[in-house]
Amino acid sequence: MKSIAERMTIPQLIVYVSKFMFENDLTDIAGGNISARDGDVLYMTPTLAGNQWHWNIDTDDIVSGPVTKIDDLKQDPRFTREGLSHLAIYKAFPYVGAVIHAHPKYINPFVACSKTIPPMLSASMQFGELQYHAEAAHYSQDQAEKIVDVLKSQEERMQKKAAAVLMPRHGIIVASMNLMTALDCVQRMNTNAFTVLAQKWLE
């Protein structure tokens, strides 16, 4: 039996992941963005996919372009607001095949007050304690570079599965070898964040 990724094109898979994330509180209407690389072509969700379409997007809405023509991709009016961070990750780590920026329900309380998230479950130990990038303006090239700085110490994690960076008062960004693994890791991290929060109930 073929896996979900084997049954779909990259644009179809991005649409699937978008809806899965929204329906499972892994992101919200306020934002988030998803991208994937297939050879020399990049694919990204359009800007305001949550705000304007409630993540009910189709393959025709996906922004795409060759890696060799990044400037053209940036000029597309649908270029996602966090696109600079996605592009910086792909440039710094050519083996990365997917990037997800999200606002997961149980990670949000941590990023609201810039608290790191320790691993509590065996499923999340591989990610270590989730850390923040240094302060930077949202959607800026400065932010993109500071995200890359945090990921530089996590290359082994990205090559094996995925690595994450927490974004102050904003959300999380995850880089992985492929999109399904990135999605898997976003959910693991969100479940782990819930587990950390739930410890208070057991005291």
Model segments located where?
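Glycine-rich flexible loops
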Residues: 1-203
